[in-house]
């Protein structure tokens, strides 16, 4: 896939398409229309057709899309056969929930280890994942760990991000309110649950359905 030719908005929707197509395949469905996809993933059909057009002819007019072909295509496009090993830093309530969940519906993403400073948690396993002391971060992060989930207090988020920048980590999923400064070779996605909730409430009040 030639990433530079695909808008980031399209790239963000690809996992959404893939998950739905997986479910279709498991149900035995052989083909699907853009209208059916639109209804399921809540993306208008014109956008879906435009997204798919970046990859060439994925379907046929009047027929729709072959489910097995789409499944195979997106599996390869999203590198689903490659395991992405993840480290989690911050084993509070949210971090603990992640460890128990550990992407059970996504077989190619696994949290391999976690880090915290709590004496009660360091040296234990949560959801089968070992918890190490934060002091061991650089030592424990092997070259296989390229993604980190950050669920630490906002006050220490930047310092942890600075330490991650000295490892082989190239992607950070930041669940803290802090807006982090990282080097250009690290991609960071910010997910502020409080902001998301405020946005939802605003839309409920100002854009009633």
Curated annotation (Swiss-Prot):
Superkingdom of origin organism: Bacteria
Residues at which NAD(+) binds? 90-95
**Localization:** Cytoplasm
Provide the GO MF annotations for this entry. DNA binding; DNA-binding transcription factor activity
Task: Quote the DNA-binding region ranges, renumbered to this chain.
Answer: 16-55
Under the heading InterPro entries, the entry gives: CoA-bd (IPR003781), NAD(P)-bd_dom_sf (IPR036291), Rex_DNA-bd_C_dom (IPR009718), Tscrpt_rep_Rex (IPR022876), WH-like_DNA-bd_sf (IPR036388), WH_DNA-bd_sf (IPR036390)
Q: Which family does it belong to?
A: Belongs to the transcriptional regulatory Rex family.
Report the PANTHER family cross-referenced here.
Answer: REDOX-SENSING TRANSCRIPTIONAL REPRESSOR REX, REDOX-SENSING TRANSCRIPTIONAL REPRESSOR REX 1
- Quaternary structure per UniProt? Homodimer.
Function text: Modulates transcription in response to changes in cellular NADH/NAD(+) redox state.
UniProt name for this protein? Redox-sensing transcriptional repressor Rex
* Classification lineage: Bacteria, Bacillati, Bacillota, Bacilli, Bacillales
Q: Which gene encodes it?
A: rex
């Amino acid at each position: 896939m030639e990433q530079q030719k695909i808008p980031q908005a399209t790239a963000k929707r690809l996992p959404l398409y893939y998950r739905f197509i997986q479910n279709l395949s498991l149900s035995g469905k052989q083909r699907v229309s853009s209208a059916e996809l639109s209804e399921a993933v809540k993306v208008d059909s014109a956008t879906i057709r435009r997204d798919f057009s970046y990859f060439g002819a994925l379907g046929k007019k009047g027929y729709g899309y072959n489910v097995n072909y789409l499944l195979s295509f997106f599996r390869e496009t999203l590198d689903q056969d490659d395991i992405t090993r993840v480290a989690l830093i911050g084993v509070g309530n949210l971090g603990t929930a992640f460890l128990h969940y550990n992407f059970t519906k996504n077989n190619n993403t696994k949290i391999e280890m976690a880090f915290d400073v709590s004496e009660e948690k360091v040296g234990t396993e949560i959801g089968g994942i070992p918890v190490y002391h934060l002091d061991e971060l650089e030592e424990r992060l092997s070259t296989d760990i390229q993604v980190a989930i950050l669920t630490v207090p906002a006050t220490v988020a930047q310092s942890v991000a600075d330490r991650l920048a000295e490892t082989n980590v190239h992607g950070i999923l930041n669940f803290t309110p802090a807006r982090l400064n990282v080097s250009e070779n690290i991609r960071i996605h910010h997910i502020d649950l409080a902001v998301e909730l405020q946005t939802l409430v605003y839309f409920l009040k100002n854009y009633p359905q």
